[in-house]
Amino acid sequence: MERLLVFADFDWLDKPELVGELCYEKLRGSESYAFRFDDNWLKFHAGIKLSEDINNYPGLQYTQPGNDIFGCFSDALPDRWGRTLLKRREQIQASEEKRAVRNLSSFDYLMGIDDFSRMGGFRLKRELDGDFINVSPSLKIPPLTELRQLVLASQEVEKSEENDVLPEKKWIAQLIQPGTSLGGARPKAGVLDDR
């Protein structure tokens, strides 16, 4: 079973606080998700309901059969454009590593999004004392001055999609950080305006 520690980084908190643990398991083609609140979160924030499908009590809670990931986490998942970028990255990596392409789950998509641009107030860690996942000092959200390059990269990925071929790795690498967390089907990317 894979797991991620979920932290709340809400604007009213002084610092990120551990909310609980999100677990994922795939058995015989069937995916299941479970969530367990941290005792301290329940002690101090029991009045905050994160999602209609997670109740504020201790112990493991599972998604309903046939349901994907819990609602509060699905809000942070990429839509079609972000999923396309993450799928193509997986295909390119599989080709380079000479292995079969993995089918990505909602858990994979959640882990694949840049920490800075992930929608909502959740941050994720593998280990309690570890770093937040997908915090990349070298691949930050680009400045507004790189907008033309992002448009070109998006156009190249779209051409590849139309022709049903893998895009070049450089185009995907350029778009993964700024382009996976925003919703919708059309190409888009977040940029920073330093002014």
Features from the language model and the residues they span:
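Phosphate/dinucleotide-binding and metal-coordinating scaffold of catalytic cores
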Residues: 1-195
